[in-house]
Amino acid sequence: MEKGTEHKSNVTLQSFTSSSTHQERLTPMMEQYIEIKAVNNDCLLFYRMGDFYELFFNDAIIASQALGITLTTRGKHLGKDIPMCGVPVHSADDYLQKLIACGYRVAVCEQMEDPAEAKKRGSKSIVQREVVRLVTPGTITEEKLLDPTRANYLMTLARIKTSDREEFALSWIDISTGIFRVTESHHEKLLTDIMRVDPQEVIVADSLLHDKSLKSLFNVLGHIISPQSATLFDTITAEHDICNYFKLSTLEGVADYSRPELSAIAAAIRYIEKTQITHRPPLMRPERQNEKATLFIDAATRLNLELIRTTSGQRDGSLLKTIDRTVTGGGSRLLADRLISPLTSPEAIDKRLDSIAFFLRNTSLSEAAHLILKGGPDMSRAVSRLALGRGEPRDIATIRRGFEIISELNQLLNNKLLPQEISDVKEVFSRLPTALHIRLNQALTDDLPLLKRDGGFIRPNYHQELDKMRNLRDESRRIIAELQVRYAKETDIKTLKIKHNNVLGYFIEVTTLQASALTNNPQAKAHFIHRQTIANAMRFTTTELAELESRIAHAANHVITLELEIFDMLVNEIIAQADFIRKVSEALAVLDVSVALAYLAEEQGYCRPIIDNSLTFHITAGRHPVVEQALRKQAIEPFVANDCNLSAKNNHQYAAIWLLTGPNMGGKSTFLRQNALIAIMAQMGSFVPATSAHIGVVDRLFSRVGASDDLARGRSTFMMEMVETATILNHASSHSLVILDEIGRGTSTFDGLSIAWAAVEYLHEVNHCRAILATHFHEMTALTKKLDRLHNVTMKVKNWEGNVIFLHEVTEGAADRSYGVQVAKLAGLPEEVITRATDVLHQLEQSEMAGKGHKLIDDLPLFNLQTISTTHKKTDKYDAIKEALKNIHPDELSPKDALEELYRLKKLEKESSL
């Protein structure tokens, strides 16, 4: 919830409850509301009133603004109107989605009985209501509220502090799929670990909010932080609570969790029990994440490289969006998971690459699998909704359709020599619970209603008693039709109709003119009982019709009751198979990702990388995957591929460092990023945009590309640059890959050059890492004489008729200039500015900077009116002549006309020079 909202809501209720006892009497309904709201004061309360959820007081003001709905009033308190707004129950999910997106938490309060049951306890009794669920950003499961391509993680942050140290752990759960993971962390790594998972809600002990050392972290995370009572993280009963949830007698032999990990896991479980009230989602046992098993990518690097979203927060333009060819929600989520956590084991990476290679070789099999998978149902999320009591017939249909797809894919993969990863998938498919699959096919109709309360989702001939009740219901309706014919004949009123509405039930309707035949005839009057008079018509009933209506209602209600009982039986059978459904969902996702990456490799011309434990980094004809596809879509010139070889040379123990110089707009930043992205794609187990690639596993990837302020923490661009550079120099190893773009540019020339110089030496002599460093400090190219593993490379350019052409090719050597003025000209700076800048640059290049600054200033006076005027005159002269030449068409001129045009041009030249 946004800061200040909770406090404001508390004040409203406190003032209300403290004064209500002696100021004025509350209505019973409002007393009930206040009582329930007081227990859920950190949430907006959706209070069920018939077909609406209503909100009151400050909740109503907040919701009306967030949802754009009308704010009205209901009743008064202390002489003031009570604010109120409401949303229809049938469309509540749409409104919940908006509130959750704004960071609010919502308590859903339902009616636990109907008004008729309440009245049995007394005429003044009110309907019993209870909060059945807390809806928070990290605990949603509704299909409408979830992005099918994105995991929805709830994270807990636990800290165990002793006198001499503090330990941290993070656990995260997606209750919509059952994923449950945990890892240890430390203070410096917390932000990186949290950003990698990208949770929608982070649970922390409220006591941590006052810890100054964590303040900057919480400021960055913003509204996704959800403070809870510190008792949620209690470790005394943590093991007991975990065992109780997973129905284990002990954790021994299951996992050896540390104390911080136990605290984080227990907090997650307790929070789920708190928000889900009576239901427990089927979760995997917490899987410990080994930080050494994945490529470490810090928060700044993830942002700079735009892996999941761009720096502006958009998915379009990110690497994930560019390479995603999956066709299922689970496949898309798995692809994102692999992208944020690339592997460091060559064996594990090769298993994934083998799967892609297999489908590239077997294109017909790949196409068939792709067609079967296309639009495949999200079984893991469906079973979670069913387990939480939020399932509908279409969720069961999702399981049925999923089983059909598994059966088809299992048959497709039969008798094939499969790679290990796909063989494991096939093994899971072969364990399909056939009996349940058959039962679902037998029980469910083909076209299912949206809501189970509507009925009609169980096939005829599946359940004998249900068929009997349906026949009775349908037969009664036929009898109604026959009764109408008989009554019309008996009364001689041909227009007599038997109708139905929710107020009167079944009734006989005749026009007012014909009603006298029933009201004036004593015999008819005794038989036809008057119910209602409306404009132009009168309504009646009979004892026979009332009894028939009772039988119809009983049969119809019994039909719904039986269908719901069958629904619950099927749900229980499905939940009993929850572990299998989760595993088979994972297998479907693996297959989808493998087929999709094979499709991507074929479509884009990617190659299989060689991955080992060496210090090699050799990319031939590498391309930037995002830029390349963008250029192709825009039908612009093709992307220029470039080699990159950071491998050790001349029997050196350690790998090389490239110092990249060249012009602005030459493609330096693109080249830097593309090599980082190629490394990530290779280690996530994907083919890569290159002709060939040999990469020794990268343990840590650091990228300092682009400039940005950290205003939230009061850091300038230069300070941010230095903080990120410090992280690199302090943590990079010989197996790391470092990408640095123009280090030191945020300060004065000499300061920046000095820092960049020292950083390169440190990377070379201490870190021994593979690195590409782009710079405009051309003085640094001299370092290659001192540092034998440092190599100069530059971006090629071509000068043509005074203009610079960027070739975007990387070649050996060093640039002697940056072509900044030429780039400024391309950007459209005024011509007088370009002319002036050229003059200044020329004189600067002719002078020695040190000791001659004052003379240089004297030689270069500031802009003055004469300079600008002269420049404008030159510009006007050239523009006039150009315009005249543009309007001349030589092929259409006679010799006389040509001579006249020549004289006119000469006259223009004279006038322009005055």
Swiss-Prot record:
Record: residues binding ATP: G662, P663, N664, M665, G666, G667, K668, S669
HAMAP family named in the record: MutS
SUPFAM superfamilies: DNA repair protein MutS, domain I, DNA repair protein MutS, domain II, DNA repair protein MutS, domain III, P-loop containing nucleoside triphosphate hydrolases
UniProt-recorded Gene Ontology molecular function terms: ATP binding; ATP-dependent DNA damage sensor activity; damaged DNA binding; mismatched DNA binding
Biased amino acid composition, Polar residues: 10-21
Protein purpose: This protein is involved in the repair of mismatches in DNA. It is possible that it carries out the mismatch recognition step. This protein has a weak ATPase activity.
Keyword Plastid: no
Protein name per Swiss-Prot or TrEMBL: DNA mismatch repair protein MutS
Annotated organism of origin: Bartonella bacilliformis (strain ATCC 35685 / KC583 / Herrer 020/F12,63)
Region feature Disordered, mapped onto this chain: 1-23
Signal peptide: none
The entry's keywords: ATP-binding, DNA damage, DNA repair, DNA-binding, Nucleotide-binding
InterPro entries: DNA_mismatch_repair_MutS, DNA_mismatch_repair_MutS-lik_N, DNA_mismatch_repair_MutS/MSH, DNA_mismatch_repair_MutS_C, DNA_mismatch_repair_MutS_clamp, DNA_mismatch_repair_MutS_core, DNA_mismatch_repair_MutS_N, DNA_mismatch_repair_MutS_sf
Family affiliation: Belongs to the DNA mismatch repair MutS family.
Gene that encodes it: mutS
A Pfam family reported for this protein in Swiss-Prot or TrEMBL: MutS_V
Taxonomic superkingdom: Bacteria
Record-level GO cellular component terms: cytosol
Gene Ontology terms: biological process: mismatch repair
